[in-house]
Design a protein with these regions (language model features):
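N-terminal, charge-rich interaction modules
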Residues: 1-60, 64-67, 78, 179-181, ...
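Internal, well-folded beta-alpha domain core
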Residues: 71-190, 196-197
């Protein structure tokens, strides 16, 4: 029997997947991400949508303490079948608040020379992608340096990120997320402070 609802859900999931890939291919550009699911506790609907689009039974997820609730864990297990890990060093994805993102950036999975893609993607929730301290993004996918203003991110975070990604192509990818929008920051993106380029 034809199931229109299932087809619509699949189409919406495919659109979300393409939009997320586009955000990673065009670092620093803000994209509006239609939600596939309602917000759950502290986890934005957009954050959960990213995990629903990218996660599956072969992936693993680390939840920072604020997000490690029974409701969120149940939701992720049901919709993604991903394994939920307490060891961040083994996780493929992680949900973090911006305030917690700087902690032990070098502790995440960064891939290896043969399989650099076997690394972590950090989903970092913030309050705004336009009202933070100004930094410049440059690198692959960016035609000319682009100004980015992610709220709740300290300069020390960008320095820790540079150190964690110093042995490219090994490194950690990031997606910054608000209740409606996402901004990609792959490991290949160079981040500098205004005037440093």
């Amino acid at each position: 029997m034809f199931d229109q609802a299932s087809m619509n859900n699949a189409q919406q999931g495919a659109r979300a997947f393409r939009l997320i890939l586009n955000a990673m291919a065009r670092p620093g550009k803000v994209f509006t991400l239609p939600s596939l699911i309602e917000r759950s506790g502290p986890a934005y609907a957009t954050t959960l949508t990213v995990l629903l689009a990218l996660g599956d039974h072969l992936t693993s997820i680390y939840l920072a303490k604020a997000f490690s609730t029974a409701e969120i864990e149940k939701l992720l297990r049901f919709h993604t079948a991903s394994q939920l890990l307490e060891d961040r060093a083994q996780a493929d994805f992680a949900i973090l608040n911006a305030a917690d993102a700087e902690m032990a950036l070098d502790a995440w999975k960064r891939g290896n020379p043969e399989y650099p893609d076997q690394s972590a993607t950090l989903l970092i929730q913030t309050t705004s992608l336009t009202l933070g301290q100004e930094v410049q993004f440059s690198g692959p996918g960016i035609q000319s340096p682009i100004t980015v203003r992610i709220a709740d991110i300290n300069p020390s975070f960008w320095k820790a990120r540079a150190a964690a990604n110093a042995t490219f192509p090994l490194g950690v990818d990031m997606i910054f997320i608000t209740p409606q929008e996402i901004l990609g920051c792959p490991r290949s993106t160079h981040v500098s402070f205004a005037g440093d380029i």
